[in-house]
């Protein structure tokens, strides 16, 4: 276990920010004020487009946690206990998962300080990120493993608690690829021959691309998103774009939920809009599956469900999708009343996606 002298400046800064936050609560008490904590309202109606950064961020509407009410007082109490835990964790240079924090709270001496659900503890960590301006990774808090992986011509060095490791994301890994760590800022890019990043929603399609040698033939960094991408995955994608100047493309199923996967990569998510500048890659381009692909290739489809239709209509009102391209595609999908999976391309043969669909789309987009 590391001592105080071993902790990094980032760790010290994170701890100081937490202590300052707790001190602010104390000062409010000392001044005879009711303690409060103000955070941006995390709803779709409170995100605005940042013209400078080209990402969606929280607007001016705020919500206030106030000890004037029982529920507000309990939230602030839980915040204080959590700050104490995080401060001690940083002092000892340890880490924990979001799940562990939820269970660990059961050992706290006040029942009112304990979390009732994991969503409650997760949301509090997000609140603390916002008010302290420190990312949860710098609190040494991590989610459960996302399982997201990278395959392609990239040599990197990863810092681990067992020392540094140099890994080539083709030569030194099996077909499963290199697993993205919880904090990708511990990675240093050493060398690469990649021409672009291809983010893939499903594991089945990712495996098809690797088996067909797409990463090798086209010098692609294939990033498996694993559904809605974790923060670590989005951070790595942004770093690959910003630091290696690689174009980023996103390849998903053709349904409204998958379009939101693209949205989280490109524009940022509503839940983490306070980190959009850190996580979002606004230059990312959507490959498909587009509704027009469903029509053009006569792909096997399923009918849209009521929830699909509601989601598409909601996206038409979502500022992240208010572009000519997305409005045209969503209107088309509502008109044809169909959706399709990535693997529906296999109806034209197992090699169609790597020999025809992706090369043609990437050429149209100016990537190849």
Curated annotation (Swiss-Prot):
Enzyme nomenclature, EC number: 5.6.2.2
Residues of the Topo IIA-type catalytic domain: 9-148
The encoding gene: top6A
Molecular functions (GO terms): ATP binding; DNA binding; DNA topoisomerase type II (double strand cut, ATP-hydrolyzing) activity; magnesium ion binding
Domain of life: Archaea
Task performed by this protein: Relaxes both positive and negative superturns and exhibits a strong decatenase activity.
Catalytically driven reaction(s): ATP-dependent breakage, passage and rejoining of double-stranded DNA
Subunit structure: Homodimer. Heterotetramer of two Top6A and two Top6B chains.
Active site: 103 (o-(5'-phospho-dna)-tyrosine intermediate)
Organism: Haloarcula marismortui (strain ATCC 43049 / DSM 3752 / JCM 8966 / VKM B-1809)
Protein name: Type 2 DNA topoisomerase 6 subunit A
One Pfam family hit: Topo_VI_alpha
InterPro entries: Spo11/TopoVI_A, Spo11/TopoVI_A_N, Spo11/TopoVI_A_sf, Topo_VI_alpha, TopoVI_A, TOPRIM_Topo6A/Spo11, WH-like_DNA-bd_sf
GO cellular component, one term: chromosome
Gene3D superfamilies hit by this protein: 3.40.1360.10, Winged helix-like DNA-binding domain superfamily/Winged helix DNA-binding domain
Biological process, per Gene Ontology: DNA topological change
């Amino acid at each position: 276990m590391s001592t105080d002298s071993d902790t990094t400046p980032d760790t010290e800064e994170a701890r100081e920010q937490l202590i300052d936050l707790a001190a602010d609560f104390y000062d409010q008490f000392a001044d005879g004020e009711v303690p409060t904590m103000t955070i941006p309202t995390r709803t779709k109606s409170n995100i605005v487009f940042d013209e400078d950064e080209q990402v969606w961020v929280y607007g001016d509407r705020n919500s206030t946690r106030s000890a004037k009410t029982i529920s507000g007082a309990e939230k602030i109490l839980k915040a204080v206990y959590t700050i104490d835990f995080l401060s001690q964790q940083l002092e000892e240079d340890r880490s924990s998962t979001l799940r562990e924090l939820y269970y660990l709270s059961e050992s706290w001496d006040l029942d009112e300080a304990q979390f009732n659900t994991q969503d409650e503890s997760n949301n509090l960590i997000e609140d603390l990120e916002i008010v302290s301006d420190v990312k949860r990774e710098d609190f040494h808090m991590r989610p459960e493993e996302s399982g997201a992986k990278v395959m392609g011509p990239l040599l990197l060095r990863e810092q681990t608690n067992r020392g540094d490791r140099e890994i080539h994301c083709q030569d030194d890994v099996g077909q499963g690829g290199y697993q993205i760590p919880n904090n990708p800022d511990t990675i240093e890019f050493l060398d690469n021959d990649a021409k672009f990043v291809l983010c893939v929603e499903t594991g089945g399609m990712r495996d098809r691309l690797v088996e067909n040698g797409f990463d090798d033939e086209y010098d692609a960094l294939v990033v498996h998103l694993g559904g809605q991408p974790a923060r670590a995955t989005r951070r790595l994608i942004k770093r690959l774009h910003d630091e290696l100047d690689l174009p980023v493309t996103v390849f998903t199923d053709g349904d409204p939920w998958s379009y939101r996967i693209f949205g989280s990569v490109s524009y940022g998510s509503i839940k983490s809009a306070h980190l959009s500048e850190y996580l979002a890659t606004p230059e990312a381009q959507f490959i498909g599956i587009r509704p027009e692909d469903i029509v053009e290739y006569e792909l096997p489809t399923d009918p849209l469900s009521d929830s699909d239709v509601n989601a598409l209509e909601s996206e038409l009102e979502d500022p992240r999708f208010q572009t000519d391209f997305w409005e045209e595609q969503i209107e088309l999908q509502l008109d044809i009343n169909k959706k399709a999976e990535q693997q529906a391309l296999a109806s034209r043969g197992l090699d169609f996606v790597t020999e025809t669909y992706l090369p043609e789309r990437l050429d149209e987009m100016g990537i190849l």
